[in-house]
Amino acid sequence: MGHQAQHGTDDTEELLAAHRQLWCHALGYVKSMALKCALDLRIPDTIDRCGGSATLGELLAASEISASNHDYLRRVMRTLTAMRIFAASHDPAKADDAAAISYQLTPASRLLVSSSSSVDDAAGASKENTTTPSILPNIAHLVRPNTISLLFSMGEWMKDESAASVSLYETVHRQGMWACVEDDAANRASFYESMDADTRLVMQAVVRRCPHVFDGIKSLVDVGGGRGTAAAAVVAAFPHIQRCTVMDLPHVVAEAPAGTAGLSFHGGDMFEHIPSADALMLKWILHDWDEDKCIKIMERCKEAIGGKEAGGKVIIIDTVLGSRADDDDDDKTCRETYVLDLHILSFVNGAEREEHEWRRIFLAAGFRDYKITHTRGIPSIIEVFP
């Protein structure tokens, strides 16, 4: 009997754990929307302007929220604190919640302070953000209604035989994502600001943690480099690179900021021709395309670089799925990359790839070898050699 009772207890514990797990995932959107709420109310900026710590009362005043609604904000902040977006402290000597509770920035929320916050404020503002790139435009773009709403139709889209050629985004919005970006000025601005913000952070990490990747390179082409944000970070960090070209579609490079030091811009189609250089760089490019198109892009890359003995290589900054589970943080990153895979599938029928899928593309395009360097974040650096 004792054994049966223990077995029953184990079953109950397992059921309750499964129940908790399902609720956690089913309500995952609430976490995204709590984050969006904090961005809408400019909470990170307010904390930064208050010197890195702000009371609930200060957040209420800055957000123009009525004191009668203070408990709503307290509960949102409690959730975001549990998510480690913010930190919180409590002064037991103060009875009023608005004065007793104060909130601080964490490494995550420091990334959400707008780029203008610290410089706009007078003395006393936190200076930590001056060396921390803001990814506020990127995160704000990811939690827009237009971004999230299309996921409601994923199941029905998968049943459609045309899904292989028509993305979920196009099915829902009657227009492909790239066309929407170009046809809508507000959407275009949001998209490029989002990409630039992400690029500043990723490239800061790349040039600091993996400088060896750029050793010996005298000429570089950033393929699909947009407005030159990634290339600018490279030439600033590595002055030995004598020639750096940003290649993208003509209408994209036409919007590049004028006078970017050390860069030239080339309008063209990467499926047709890529300018020659010692090395090529592709950041978040190949995950937008199916395998056949990736092979074609890599074939053009191979034509554009010299042999391995001359230092020729392709530098890919992208995700490698399922490659890191050495500790808890790496395991979380691994799970998050699978979510990113569904995100990119929904928008452009793209894919994040496992190492064997990357290898298949490289070999099919005529490359002989590659080396993967993992970062502590989502992207990895893949050096591909002819």
Swiss-Prot record:
The keyword Secreted does not apply. Disulfide bonds: none annotated. Optimum pH is 7.0. GO terms for biological process: biosynthetic process; methylation. It catalyses: TRIBOA beta-D-glucoside + S-adenosyl-L-methionine = DIMBOA beta-D-glucoside + S-adenosyl-L-homocysteine + H(+). Expressed in seedlings and newly formed crown roots. Highest expression in the scutellar node. Low to non detectable levels in cob, tassel and mature organs like husk or leaves. S-adenosyl-L-methionine binds at residues 224, 248, 270, 283. Keywords: Methyltransferase, S-adenosyl-L-methionine, Transferase. It is an enzyme of class 2 (transferase). InterPro entries: COMT-like, O_MeTrfase_dom, Plant_O-MeTrfase_dimerisation, SAM-dependent_MTases_sf, WH-like_DNA-bd_sf, WH_DNA-bd_sf. O-methyltransferase involved in the benzoxazinoid glucoside biosynthesis. Can use 2,4,7-trihydroxy-2H-1,4-benzoxazin-3(4H)-one 2-D-glucoside (TRIBOA-glucoside) as substrate, but not aglucone TRIBOA, caffeic acid, ferulic acid, apigenin or quercetin. Belongs to the class I-like SAM-binding methyltransferase superfamily. Cation-independent O-methyltransferase family. COMT subfamily. This is TRIBOA-glucoside O-methyltransferase BX7.
